Amino acid sequence: MIQQLLREWPPGYGGVERVAHELASVWAGSVSSFDVQRRAGAEADALPVSYPRQVLPCSLPLGRLSLPLPSRPLWRLLCSREPLHGHLPSPGVLLVLLLARLLRPQRRVSVHWHCFLDPEPGLNGRLFALYQWVALRSLPWLSGVVTTSPLLARELVRCGCRAERVMVLPCCLSREQEQQMLQLPPRQRRSSTDPLRLIFIGRLDSYKRLDWLLQALATLSGPWRLEVVGDGPRRSAFEQLGRQLFAADARQRIRFQGRLDEDGKRRCLARADLLVLPSDRCNEAFGIVQLEAMAAGIPALAFQRHRSGMGWVGQLADLPWPQTPEALPAVLQQLAADPVLNARLGLQARERYQQLFARTVWEQRLQCLYPAADASG
C-alpha cells in the first residue's frame, strides 16, 4: 500500500484533494493531512471514502504557511517503510517528504507536482517564491515526480528535473461521476433564437476572474444565460458587478447557485451548452471540472497560461482560438451565433475525454507510471 500526504482534508472540493482521493481509492493506503482549514468532522464528505485518513498536528497558519508539529502520527509516518507520495504545493508536505527520505534513503518517496506558483507581492509572495525554489531543487533527491499535463512536465524538465523521472498522470473522475456524466444525452442543437447557456464552476475568489466572463458576456449581441456554481469571498462583488453591467436584466440572466452537492452540480451541467473557467493564475493548472463537462458532452473554455495545463485539457480541433482573456468575447460571440458549431464541439469534447481522460485510461497510466517513477528507490 502507498501512503499519501497533503495539506487539506480529502476528498474536499479542490483539485489536489480530489486527486489524492482517487489515488487512495486505488492504492488503499492511508492518507495523512494537515487539515489546515479544519474540515475533518466539520462537514460531510463530498464523495464516498473507503480509505483510512488521519490528521497530522500542524502550526497555526502564517498567511498560507503551515508546518507539521512533532507528534506520534508524524513519527510513524516518517519511520514507515511503505512508499510515501506527497502532494505539492505545500512547504509542510515538502518538509515531511525530505525528512522521510533522509531517515530511510531506500524508501520510495515520490511527489505529485500539481502546479507552479505565480510570484506575488509582499512577504507571503517572497516566502512562497523561496519555497518553490527549494522545492524544484529538492525534486531530483526524491524517487520521482508525477504531474498532470505534458506542459507542466516540460516545464519541470526545463527547471532541472531529469526527464526520465517526470511522469504525466492527468486528473480523473471517479467511476460513478464518469458513468453519470457519460449517461447524459448529447446536447440538442439549440435554435438561433435560443440563449447560449453558460456555466461557471469554482470558488468565487479573485484569481478565478468571473469578472472577465461577465465583462465578455456584456459584449454579446445575442441572448445568453449564466449559472454560477460555487461560493467564496468575492461573491458579493461579482453579484454587484452583474447588476452594474446588466441592470434589471441581471437577475434573469445570471443565477448564483452557491455551493452545490454532486447531484446539483450535475443537473446544472445537464442544462449547459458551454463551461467557461477564466482563471488568471498558473496555480489553476488543470481544472477537474473541465473533465466533468467534457464527459457530459459540453465544451470547456480556459486560458492557456505559462506553466499551466488549463488550456490544454479542453482543446478541440474545430475551435482554434488564442485562449487569452482578450480573445474571450470573440469566441463567446462565435459560439453564441453558431449553434451547429457548439453542438459539434460538445461531441468532440466527449470524444477527447474518452480518449485521454477516461477512468480506464487513467488506471492504465497509474499502473505503469507509479512503479516507473519509483523504480530506482
Spell out what each predicted region is:
Residues 108-110, 118-141, 175:
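Nucleotide-sugar donor phosphate/pyrophosphate-binding loop at the beta->alpha transition
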Residues 70-71, 83-106, 110-118:
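An aromatic- and histidine-rich active-site surface loop
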Residues 314-326, 333-340:
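Conserved acidic donor-binding segment of nucleotide-sugar-dependent glycosyltransferases
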Residues 3, 189-208, 214-218, 227:
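Conserved donor-binding/catalytic core segment of Leloir-type glycosyltransferases
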Residues 151, 171-172:
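Carbohydrate-associated surface elements
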Residues 4-66, 232:
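N-terminal strand-loop element at the rim of the active site
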Residues 239-263:
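Nucleotide-activated donor-binding/catalytic signature segment of Leloir-type glycosyltransferases, i.e.
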Residues 295, 299-304:
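Short hydrophobic beta-strand element within catalytic cores of glycosyltransferases
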